[in-house]
Amino acid sequence: MSSPLEQALAVMVATFHKYSGQEGDKFKLSKGEMKELLHKELPSFVGEKVDEEGLKKLMGDLDENSDQQVDFQEYAVFLALITIMCNDFFQGSPARS
């Protein structure tokens, strides 16, 4: 049986591949695929509607090789940044102080 961390890693990989390749390269997320992933998989972070301007900025920030898509490595950086943000939030919460 796999550990919770191993399960979490498997979910992160499976989630990427669930959305990648619907619009072209099966190993990259297009802007539309990234938008759908954010809306369906991270609704607490984006709210009910994904902000187009925010999505454009996010894609630009993540897209290190400027191919207008997010590859797995760029996606992993995105997840790491979200994880750091969550950790910072919980470290600052009154229950942890």
Swiss-Prot record:
UniProt keyword terms in alphabetical order: Calcium, Metal-binding, Repeat
Name of the molecule in the record: Protein S100-A2
Origin species: Bos taurus (Bovine)
Domain EF-hand: 12-47, 50-85
Pfam families noted in UniProt: S_100
Family matches, as SMART domains: S_100
Biological process terms in GO annotation: endothelial cell migration
Binding site for Ca(2+) 1: K28, E33
Keyword Isomerase: no
Stored SUPFAM superfamilies: EF-hand
GO molecular function: calcium ion binding; calcium-dependent protein binding; transition metal ion binding
Function (record text): May function as calcium sensor and modulator, contributing to cellular calcium signaling. May function by interacting with other proteins, such as TPR-containing proteins, and indirectly play a role in many physiological processes. May also play a role in suppressing tumor cell growth.
Miscellaneous comment: This protein binds two calcium ions.
Subunit text: Homodimer. Interacts with FKBP4. Interacts with PPP5C (via TPR repeats); the interaction is calcium-dependent and modulates PPP5C activity. Interacts with TPPP; this interaction inhibits TPPP dimerization.
